[in-house]
Amino acid sequence: AVHGDPDIWYNFRQIEAMVSNFPQYNWFDAMTAYPQGKNIDWGPLFPLIASALCIMTGAVQRVDCIAVSSWVPVLFGILMVPVVFFLGRLIAGWKAGIIAAIFIAVVSGEYFYRTMAGVVDHHCAEIFFTTVFCLFYIYTIRKASEHEVRLKSPSSLKPILVPSVIAGVAFAAAMAVMPTTLLFAMIVALYTLIQYTWNAFHGKSTDYLLVVNGVVSVFAIASLAIVGVHSPVYSLATYSAAPTHAIALLFFGTALLQIFSMLSREKPWVFVGMTVAGAIGCIAVAALVSPTLVNSGFSALSSFFGQRFQDFPIEEQKPWSLLQIW
């Protein structure tokens, strides 16, 4: 049975329109926010995958499109099992990988709902692509810890280039599903700051982070360029120029930390001082040059760590709880 969630039926509408005009995506819907209409803030990749599957199976009528695309969340759920196994094995060994794979196959709550047959929503694709991104990003970091990476030695970059590219492609795919997956860029930015600081106090090189963050940034910006700018609102949660600017800041921020680490070699507190001064300076410059970007950033943080009254009806934006997990 198909769920009654209006988002699911809206996805069916987008998929049906895409099947008829493949691969054209319906970026503006006159019937949403009637009578003005509305620019669609959801990405095109999930409907593209579903509509391509419909066309390949010969499902072009409405009922057939619904029947075929209803299985797309299940397919993503199946693909998550090996991804979670490898992620668990990478972090804590093969036994942890098996346990994680078993749990991801039987866990209930929000995850089960998002990967259930008939719940045709983009969240299953968000989960899959961001998990693949985490898998290869962590794998790249693990490889860098086993083989010293130096920017002055191009041959030392070989072990991390391929996993960095795969991580970049996965993140690019996630951004093409939904711009709010930009959240993972914020996680990467926080990790990068912590890792650079840790390595500064322990006398270790952090060249590999410049490489992997650079590759991820290039692929993410390329993905956003292919998708294009379709929102008149400058916001990190829409397909405006804001997500592209934020991804560029991730790379330039990493490059700035790399410069600070090179200038303050064996002087960790100098690195900390330069980082704090640099952060204050960057925020001040951004506030002067593009106050809209700064406001959008603070709004995104407020939405993530708090909850605005207008977001209350949105299930996926509610604070997580043990009840939702299980």
List each language-model region with its residue ranges.
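Active-site lumenal/periplasmic loops and adjacent helix-entry segments of GT-C-fold
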Residues: 1-91, 95-103, 107-131, 149
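Transmembrane catalytic cores of multi-pass membrane glycosyltransferases
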Residues: 126, 163-166, 170-326
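Membrane-embedded helix bundles of polyisoprenyl
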Residues: 72-90, 95-197, 212-230
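Residue-level recognition of short, well-ordered coil/turn positions
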Residues: 22-23, 145, 201-202
